[in-house]
């Protein structure tokens, strides 16, 4: 039985994940791994794609991809995701942690005036841009990463001119699946920031920690910012911050970027770890005894074989070893291994696959999610569904419903165009036209009274005011349309449009994600 055949509301355990290449690795990174429990929430109005719940969060999958995933249907849950119910309510320690919860720096700070560079990394929709704005204020530089159209934003931390924070694109892993992931990985590996600020959505820790584990493997000083803690605690959730620090080996700071709470403490930690180069205290997430220790032995053996190559290529050893086992061809190219080394590593990986009972990519992903589950069980009490989320789910039933999604979309777009071209936009357009006409009349009388040459007079009145004025008359329409479409995008409606329009757009060679690009074309 495949995942495509699973009915709405039914649960199953994933047995195998088909496919190959970067797309399959992307699914594994998102938690679609053998042994994981998955529940079908709904199908798009056109029947494709489908929305799933896995590891406590929602995921959208096309039916063609779901057809490559075999499952075993179950009647009860097999994995617990509720987290601990009685966690330690310890007081969060002070600056630098004094080496209590992660490896303390050697006490030799970087030279004075050294520019402290930071990579701000996190999943999409975790509040990363809000935090970046809180850190840098209005002092930002916006551009593109070299060779791609991915936006790049840089700016110094307010009050600290010798710092520079780079806001990397929102990503879910450091695998080379999308241009955003490639750009982010290359920035960390090649630009070598002094430290990483990893922002996590506290209401969805399980999903966010996968990227955190990959960042820890890069052996760069790092501080974790638990964002949206106000929502977490406001809905009866909590996090044992000290316990999480002890398990991750890096400082963890609870914040609310939207309310500017905890940001000052985050800045102090970020400055401290960068200045003293306090590297993560943990990079080994697989137990020697777990599943016979097959993955543990393989990672350490591969690390030993590639140590010199990784150092020469400037790639963190643990990260390189994990990526080689996963089959990351870009990392393999950079290491420049000879044929004998390739054969030795392949022998180790094949042996691990036999002992573990999973293929190489799935074994590494499963190792990470097993550790994440342990962290959440020991340190996290998941919040209850907030009133906002319950209200959002009710609205979703209408906006993405089988029989209501398309009519709602047509109705909303008609309303937007009506308000733009006949109400708000038209009113502002008439107001601007009246202003231009009034200014033109005043200027006309002034030029006539001054006896200005007729040619110059005609150029100003008939050329500038009439010509430029007619072009400017479109500005209110454009601004109004931009406002409404931005409102739709910020509210999350465009993402919902991508969900139910994906099948239709693919018939003309596009994907559902292009709905946001079509949105931009409307703005133009």
Regions found by a protein language model. Name each.
Residues 387, 399-409, 514:
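Membrane-interface helix starts
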Residues 282-359, 363-373:
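Long, well-ordered amphipathic alpha-helical subdomains in the mid-to-C-terminal portions
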Residues 421-516:
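Membrane-embedded alpha-helical segments and adjacent helix-loop junctions characteristic
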Residues 90-173:
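Conserved G1/Walker A P-loop phosphate-binding module
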Residues 158-160, 183-252:
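Conserved C-terminal guanine-recognition region of P-loop GTPase G domains, centered on the G4
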Residues 347-381, 386-396, 430-472:
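Interfacial loop/helix-cap signal at membrane boundaries in integral membrane proteins
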Residues 232-287:
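Canonical P-loop GTPase G-domain recognition
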Residues 1-80:
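Compact, glycine-rich, soluble single-domain proteins
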